[in-house]
Amino acid sequence: MNTKEYILDQFKTYPHLELEDLMKFLYQSTFGCEHLVSDQDTVKKHIQQEFDTQMDSCNSIEYLDGDYVRLHLNYGLSVNTLSTLFILSSQQEKNGIKQLEDKIQILLELISNHTLPFSLEESTNILLKWKEDGYPAIHHSNTFNQMYHPSYRLIHKKYVPFLELFKYIDDKHPSILLIDGRCASGKTTLGILLKQVYDCNVFKMDDFFLQPHQRTNKRLESPGENVDHERFEQEVLIPLSKHEDVNLSKFNCSTMSIQSPSLIPYKPFNIIEGSYSMHSNLQKYYDFSVFLTLNKEEQIERLKKRNPNMLNNFIQRWIPLEELYFNAFSIQDKCNILIDTSKA
């Protein structure tokens, strides 16, 4: 959708809106929640107050004309999760004024040709005054508040693919959550995000590459056997299943040896992240499993940006090995949820 279509969709969704509501829509589309963010305790307090008093029955995700969405409080996220995503979404927008003024021009054109039922002269004066004042943040009109009882927070649209996962975590409180999937699909990025949102440990399969003596032709030719899942089970999953601390010994690729162990205190919520982590010998330990995927074109583009010198190695070796593992054990079908990150 383009700016014109977004504006008309707003009018269709909220037929009683006023000009200032469209101004707010354009402001939010451009600047997101940058002007609203304070400390997390204050943000959480305000969200909790809205939870307790809100009359908004909408539970949808409302896309804006830019990088943000309106996530209505009734969607189902906890106060802590929503407040954290809200704060993570705040950022300084480059060229924001230029973007906003381009959108305002389209709004005026829709008013000028009578597509929108507002006075052109009055609207022009209001918008010029807004510009003179430096484009301050706009409130919803009294009419909009009375008719629609809006209750939402702005978050970046890159978090939308993971909202159902956040909702599951908030509702079910899993102890061990798995993230497997295709290379460059965002497994590490999701693990980092979950650690920002929740009090959890993240354990990576990349720390459990095979030691030199394990790299036999027989093993490397077997689907899913090119990681040390045996050591991962003993060092990480068995202690976690017993609610015990983990003595983590990472494999160092530069020295091709295992490092000295470091103590990871037990936490009730733990993330297992990486390719081959859904190995058939490990599945019994997981409360919930996520499979991340993406289209081939996006995968190649991300790998090229990550390390162009390694691209051919991924195409010729690592991607075929992953696909062999996925197909041999129906990994995608066995995971609880599939998330396509192609557009994330």
Which residues does each predicted region cover?
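Conserved nucleotide-sensing/catalytic segment adjacent to the nucleotide-binding pocket
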Residues: 201-204, 210-263, 269-270
